[in-house]
Amino acid sequence: MKIIHLSDFHLDGETLYLEHKRLLNALITDIDKYYEEDCILVFSGDFLNVGGKNIHSQNNPFVIFKENVLDCIYTSYPLLKDRTFFVAGNHDINRDSINTSDKLAKKQLLKEYEQRDNIYDDFQKYLPGFKEYNTFVSDFYRDFKEEKNITFLESNFIIKTKDGNKIGITSLNSSFLCYDSDDLGNILLLDKQLRNSIEFIDECDVKIAVLHHPIDFFHETEKEKIQKILEKEYDLVFVGHTHKVKQEFKQTLNGICFFSNGKSLNGEESEITDYINGYTIIDYIPNQTLKVHLRNYSNICNKFVPNNEYGNDEGIYEVSINKNIDNEKEKTLEISDDFKIFLK
């Protein structure tokens, strides 16, 4: 299976600027090198720039993003429409709708751990700043034909690949407390977000988590716990936010997990190399190999090229995976003939 990982588009108007149209066209062309029927498209947040403040249309700004970006991709790759999974980023919250009471409640949550489970149920009824986003999510997945469970704080999906594997995808809203620009150390993932998600996709062969923020951005009381849970329960984790590429394959006592921090697809231009726009293709064979294709956008050539700063000359690196996703095989213990003599 192949996973196309996009992140951080930051749509800043009702239409795309010329350079952004060129980038999108180049992306669509580049995807063709890797595309196959079982591809999954993951977008790890920041559809909009600063809550869409420069989008003055009466239409939902996320619908405008879909029309300008996603629909162009679907024109070339229509099967991706039912295999697209995304989360909100910190730029996708409407901060104009956040009031003083919301900000005071956030301070209380960060101070008092025991209040966090209680607030989960309240946020499932009303999530400040996410009215437009949650409406978009509901509409986008209305005709989704496979298993789904969509809520304001986490959404979960189960799809099947052509080779019979069940893939569980968890979309975790890590941006629900992004009431200002000071995210670092001031955001949470609630226990129920994780517990409910793990339960829904528990019997899947491959488990994927998508969230906007890397682990380092969470509150100090949460970071280690979140890291351990993701490593134990998921095979692949996709994040965004930093606009910097970072790929980690972790094999610890907790489990085996690949973390992909996506580049900005369309962030602010910068002379800093790490901020060159790009995206990633993950070629994943469960229990065998994981191949990562790192792609950078060249403004000079108007096309995507290999990012060979992190991979080989072709922007590729590959790792072998020893994890066994067959639960029955995991329970099998083989004893060598040489050792059996000690058991007589």
How should these model regions be labeled?
Residues 8, 46, 65, 89, ...:
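Divalent metal-coordination and catalytic microenvironments
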Residues 63-188:
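Extended active-site neighborhood of metal-dependent phosphoesterases/phosphodiesterases
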Residues 283-344:
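A short C-terminal boundary segment appended to hydrolase-like catalytic domains
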Residues 174-238, 242, 247:
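Active-site-proximal segments of metal-dependent phosphoesterases and phosphodiesterases across multiple
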Residues 1-13, 166-178, 208-212, 258-263:
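Active-site-proximal beta-strand elements of phosphoester/diester hydrolases
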Residues 1-64, 69-82, 94-95, 196-203:
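N-terminal active-site segment of His-dependent metallophosphoesterases
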Residues 10-15, 48-52, 86-101, 179, ...:
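Active-site environment of divalent metal-dependent phosphoester hydrolases
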Residues 216-293:
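Conserved beta-sheet core of the metallophosphoesterase superfamily
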